[in-house]
Structures are given as C-alpha cells and as structure tokens.
C-alpha cells in the first residue's frame, strides 16, 4: 500500500470525478483466497525449475557440491530481491485505486504525466509492450505447468511417458471448455487446495534438509558469487533457468485488485515464501545426496508410495495456476479494450456475485489454440522451459521502469534511492533478461512472436481509431451548429425518449443527423450520452454522472457524461438510471427509450491517400472493426429497442 504522503501525491494527479474505493483490510479469509488466485504460477514452479537448470545445454550445470550450492543461492536471492523487495514491499504500494498490473500502472503514470505528452506516450508504449509480453507468457504457463505435473507419473512408472502428452491435452482441453460456465463453485476450493499444496512442499523438503543440513548455508550470497566467479559461463546460462522460480512474481501485483495487497503480503510471508524456500532447499539437499536424481528432482523427493497422490495434487495445483493465467488474460483484455487498445470484446459475466469473473470467447479459444500448439511442438516440459522466461523478464524490466517514474514524480524519491533501486533490482533483472536472450533460438522466439502480434494489434487499433475519430468529427460537424439549425427549421416533434450513445459533446451523433435526414422528426426528449473511461479502475456511482442541458430549455436535448473506470461495466441503461437523480423527468421515460447507435463502416481509401498507415495495417484495422463485439451487448442495450444508423468512413 502507499503511505499517506505518497497517496496524497498520487491523489493530486487524480481527476476530481474519481474517488478511491476503501482499501481492503488484512483478513485471513482473503489471504486464503489469495493462495488460489495469486500464487498458482510461482507455487508450481518447483515442479520444473531445478530439473531445467540441470538439463540445459546438455547438462552443463553439474550436480556437484559447488554447482548445487550456487544454484540454490541464486534462487534464494532472486526470490528475495525480485519478489520480496521489488514486488511485495515496493511495487504493490503503487496501486491504481486498489488495482495492480502493468496496464493499471501505465494508466496511473499517464495520469501523473498528463502535462508531459512525451513521457505519457512513452508510458503508453511501455504498457502496450508489457501487455504483449504478458500474453506471450500466457500461452506457455498452462502448457508447462500441467505437463510438468503429469510427468511425475514417469517417476513411478517409466512406461507412463507415452500418456503424458495425451493426458495433458485432455486436461487443458477440459479446462478451456469449462471457462464459459465460470469457476464460481469450484473456485471456492482453490484456496484450500493451494494451502494443502504449499504445506506439502514444506513436508517434502524438511526430511531432506535434516538429512543434509549443510544445504542451509546456500542461503549465503557468497555461494552465488563464488559460482559466478568460478564458472561464469555456466552461471550465466543457469540464470536462464533460475528465472523459472520467479515467473509468477508479476501475478502478485496484477491480481492485487482481487484480494488486496495486505492479504497477499500475509499469505506470501506467512506461508508461501517459507514453503517454497524449504522445498528448494530440500531439492538441493536431495541432489547432494543423490546426484543421479536430477531427471525429476521434485517427484524424487517423495517416497514411492506417495508418488501418485503427489501427482494428483500437483495436477490440481497446476490447473489452478493455469486458471489464474486464463482469468488474468480475460481481465487484461477487458481493461485493454476499455482503454482503447483493443476492439470491443464480447465480455460475458459468469458470476452474479463476483463482477470480476468474466469470460471472453475470442481470448479463450486463441489461448487454447496457442497452448495446444506449444504442447504438440515441444512435447515435454523441459523442452518447453527453453521457451519460457524471456517475455516475463521483459515485463519485469518494463514494470521497474514505470515504477521508477512513479516513485520519482509522485513519491519524490531522492535520486540516490532511484539509482540504488534501479541498480540493485534492475541489475538483477537485466542479468536474468540477458541470460534468457540465449533462449531465442531454442524457442524463446515464440512468446516474443505472440507479444509482437499483440503489440501490432494494439498500436494499429489505437492509431486507426484516432484517425477515424478525426474523420468522424469532420462528418458530424459541431453540435452547436446543429442546435442553431434546429432552432431555425423547428423539426416535427414526436413523443418519447431517444438516446444517442456518442463519444463526446463537441459533435453531433451521426444517428441523430440521419434520424432527422431520413425520418424528418425529433423526439420530445433527446439524450446524448458518452461513456468516459478514466485512467482509474473504478469510479463510484455517486461520482459517475455529469449532466449538461444543451441549447434552450425547450429544446429537449440533454448531454450526459458517465465516467467509469477501466474495469467498470459500460452499461448505458444503468447510467441513465443513475442520471435520473439529476433529471427527474427521466424516470417516466426509461422503459420506453429508443437507443440510436451511430455505425461507422470503415472502408479502405485509395493507396495514394493513405500515407498515415500502411496498407496491411489498414486491412487489419478494418477486419477488427467489422468483427468487434456488438455495441448493444457492450452497452447492455435491449436489442428490441436499438436502432443502428450511420455511414461509411474512409481509412
């Protein structure tokens, strides 16, 4: 959380229309919920991290005393600096109205830097790239997590190797199929299951630590330093696998809005961190005792009779981790669409009580196809690990960059503190990122490809939308001119209420112009309503409605701006119901309102006229524009009372 003087600095940059919601208190119940929502990714990394370290580059890192102690030391200090210091202690204090994640941080920085156009655009670009990298990792996490759990069967029976691939495909297929029904019922069990999982991790590690207590000395940083000095090339390569132990760090920040920062900190320091460290120390102690068990050190920690139960709970934990990633992709996509970075999406709410539980078919099936392709291409978790890490370390660096801007501009950190944080934390992250560059040729290019596609889509949509908005303004003309024309012509009036959703109050809605052009009538009451998305996650109901009477009192034209956060619904009928407090006459007309939607049919212009955008990007924008979600669904408008009118605009 942000300290009082820091929160005041942030509040100065907040628009008056926006109020902060109460911050959640630290409750054990929320901490238990956090185990199921937040810690799935980082909690299941124990399955494949050390296995990957000792399998990279044809087993270049050996299970010797020095190498094992060095690796465990690197893991401990990476978790301590990146997860504990950076995210849990500092970054999670940079909440945007209680929400976290790189898009929320980007929106917060842009609001702070509103008067610095160049810095604001840089923050926007960093946010877009960070979102792209997040999507790149979203394809890998479900695949590597589930496969690594199912591979535990091969420890009990080597012949089970042939069922790992089909079993993983079946589990993930079922997971993506059930998304449309939501996880409200089974989601209540996620916290207890993950609590059991973390206690199991500790139970597996303790006996091996007792058997080989020297492993505890690996917590000293001198082992990592010694390993780096004696075998610098191997230490650099190992950093590419050590990152697997912290890949879920960004989730702690991104999911902060669900359960609150205090609950995440309580769960992290109270259970997750101790259990993870005990398990990693236990795996290290076991490898010191049995160097030949590096093929699957996690499952080899358990006695033979416990292998099948361990595979079962590991599979449950990885499914929960995958569910968290999928839900995160849904949430980020919804936020990106409301921030104008993606087209309108068909968001479906899967819970009547939890507004954050949503389902987006386009995102769900895109993820499923990508995850399935990765499983079929790589076929084992160890091979898939070679593609994992580059995108997430890129996200680490981008989050650090945005955080330092916030710390400097809003919290007024002294320069020495900024440099110290940047050198220590940023230096570790830059080293890990550099090590992961070695993975590009062996599969690391795949998440980068996914990320690049997302960045192209977001930048194309934003640029195309800005151009179309300018063209649309020229076609619509100033609203003041329309009001003057209306006074002169005095069009025929008909009873009822006409509602015109429209981006702003400066111009005349196309649907209003066309309604007069073709029907030659104007309703008795007319409302032009704009959904204004603020750079905050939530706007309280009491602060949402801004009402302006246009023209003369007898004109019957009212402008309403409904301010919402980028995680709030864009429900137009609900906004009108809120506006009734400021428009008493509105209550009697809500049930009979007719909604006139302005449709802009984007067409490609002549090649010589289109220097503002490449031809292929125009086609991409037009395709997205024509296939985006129906606005009646996005605005929750009854289809039986919706009329669509508009015209073509050249891109």
Swiss-Prot record:
What does the UniProt keyword field contain?
Cell membrane, Ion transport, Membrane, Potassium, Potassium transport, Symport, Transmembrane, Transmembrane helix, Transport
Transmembrane stretches, start-end: 30-50, 71-91, 124-144, 158-178, 190-210, 233-253, 268-288, 310-330, 358-378, 387-407, 413-433, 437-457
Query: Any idea where this protein resides?
Result: Cell membrane
- Look up the domain of life of the source: Bacteria
Please give, as recorded in its UniProt entry, the membrane topology of this protein. Multi-pass membrane protein
Q: What InterPro entries does its record include?
A: K+_transporter (IPR003855), K_trans_C (IPR053952), K_trans_N (IPR053951), Kup (IPR023051)
Chief location bin? membrane
GO-annotated cellular components: plasma membrane
Q: Which GO terms describe its molecular function?
A: potassium ion transmembrane transporter activity; symporter activity
Question: Catalyses which reaction?
Answer: K(+)(in) + H(+)(in) = K(+)(out) + H(+)(out)
Function field: Transport of potassium into the cell. Likely operates as a K(+):H(+) symporter.
Q: Which family does it belong to?
A: Belongs to the HAK/KUP transporter (TC 2.A.72) family.
Protein name (database record):
Probable potassium transport system protein Kup
The gene it comes from is kup
